[in-house]
């Protein structure tokens, strides 16, 4: 049996742009992608802290060091520049791997720079 587990997260990313006329996806600074091991075209879930919207899309590499987090296409209707979002990536693991796998979590500042890397989340933690 396989379980779907969180394996990567960009916590409190700031949306820098929403581009309705783009084909689709989310553009993310490649440095942020590397920090949590998200790859281009990988499926991600996006949770908007400002309005509660949740959506799924795929990732396009953004310019390194730019801090870009741009929702493209129809997803642009669910965010505004300045919104805080959580970008989550899941993976399938076997029963044997469930307790061994450790997610990579990057906590971001208002400019989408990493301020802290976490390997786990604890209940009741406020960031």
From Swiss-Prot:
GO cellular component: cytosol
Species name: Bacillus cereus (strain G9842)
Main localization category: cytoplasm
Pathway: Cofactor biosynthesis; (R)-pantothenate biosynthesis; beta-alanine from L-aspartate: step 1/1
Catalytic activity, EC: 4.1.1.11
UniProt xrefs under NCBIfam families: panD
Residue numbers carrying Pyruvic acid (Ser): 25
The family this protein is said to belong to: Belongs to the PanD family.
Co-factor(s): pyruvate
Function statement: Catalyzes the pyruvoyl-dependent decarboxylation of aspartate to produce beta-alanine.
Residues holding substrate: 57, 73-75
Location of the protein in the cell: Cytoplasm
Keyword Lyase: yes
Reaction(s) the record says it catalyses: L-aspartate + H(+) = beta-alanine + CO2
Catalytic EC class: lyase
Post-translational events: Is synthesized initially as an inactive proenzyme, which is activated by self-cleavage at a specific serine bond to produce a beta-subunit with a hydroxyl group at its C-terminus and an alpha-subunit with a pyruvoyl group at its N-terminus.
Subunit structure: Heterooctamer of four alpha and four beta subunits.
InterPro entries per the UniProt record, alphabetical: Asp_de-COase-like_dom_sf, Asp_decarbox
Example of a GO biological process term: pantothenate biosynthetic process
Key word rRNA processing present: no
Name the record gives this protein: Aspartate 1-decarboxylase
GO MF terms held by the record: aspartate 1-decarboxylase activity
Residues annotated as the enzyme's active site: 25, 58
CDD domains named in the record: Asp_decarbox
A Pfam family per the record: Asp_decarbox
SUPFAM superfamilies hit by this protein: ADC-like (SSF50692)
């Amino acid at each position: 049996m396989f379980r779907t587990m969180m394996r990567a997260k960009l916590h409190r990313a700031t949306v820098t742009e929403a581009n309705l006329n783009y084909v689709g996806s989310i553009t993310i600074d490649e440095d942020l992608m590397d920090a949590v091991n998200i790859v281009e075209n990988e499926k991600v879930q996006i949770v908007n802290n400002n309005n509660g919207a949740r959506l799924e899309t795929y990732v396009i590499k953004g310019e390194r060091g730019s801090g870009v987090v741009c929702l493209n296409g129809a997803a642009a209707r669910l965010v505004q520049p300045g919104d805080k979002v959580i970008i989550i990536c899941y993976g399938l693991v076997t029963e044997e791997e469930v307790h061994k796998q450790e997610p990579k979590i990057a906590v971001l500042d208002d400019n989408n720079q990493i301020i802290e890397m976490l390997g786990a989340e604890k209940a009741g933690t406020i960031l």
